[in-house]
């Protein structure tokens, strides 16, 4: 009887082999589920980014309804004025911030710091990765990063073109980056059709532009200077002249400074755009370069049908 009771009270534990098997099974399940979870999270982030672009596109439409033209991107100085994203602040329910901004001063001016330092969620893609904090050692200090850039067309814009005797770029994007106020564009200027023309796309804080040569950041990389307040090309104005969605691979020796003026994203496989009609599309990084140029130009006469993504 005693032995029977002892038998009933006996407790069995996992053997080491059984425990290892259970751990292995759990590891396999985690390995199978983790990519699906990550994919679902990225899909949610991408959808949020799409909503940002839709909101920006609608704000530009409202700006056009008010002023009968698209926002003008100031090219007289890399320091002066403000970006198109500053101009549309009232249409992004940010009228108070807009009223605080002084367009007669630089976007780097301490007076405008109270506005340009704001990290506005609709100007920042949830998938974006900030490689390091915005530096506090030069005139970049205090300006919040952004994730979006207007389409200035198929050619880069050098604000010093006349000084160097270079031909003026074609300025064929939906938004004109120009030092001439009469070059502002309207929907009537988009003769290829607003549904066939890029309006705003993504940019990313992911390319080392150059090394700081002075100050507290000496020797550190400055990444892409994508500040939503800055009207300079590469910050809030991009072109299709350079590689589309370029990636800087450490150690491969391949880098083009022009890449900082290319549309790019931290999404996998492509870049999102809001077109002139307000529709948002994900454009594959494998798109034909000629096709991308046709989408960037507002008036080249090349109207695309089913161009594909």
Task: Identify the function of each model-found stretch.
Residues 11-45, 55:
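N-terminal single-pass transmembrane signal-anchor helix
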Residues 28, 43-309:
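Surface-exposed loop/linker segments characteristic of extracytoplasmic
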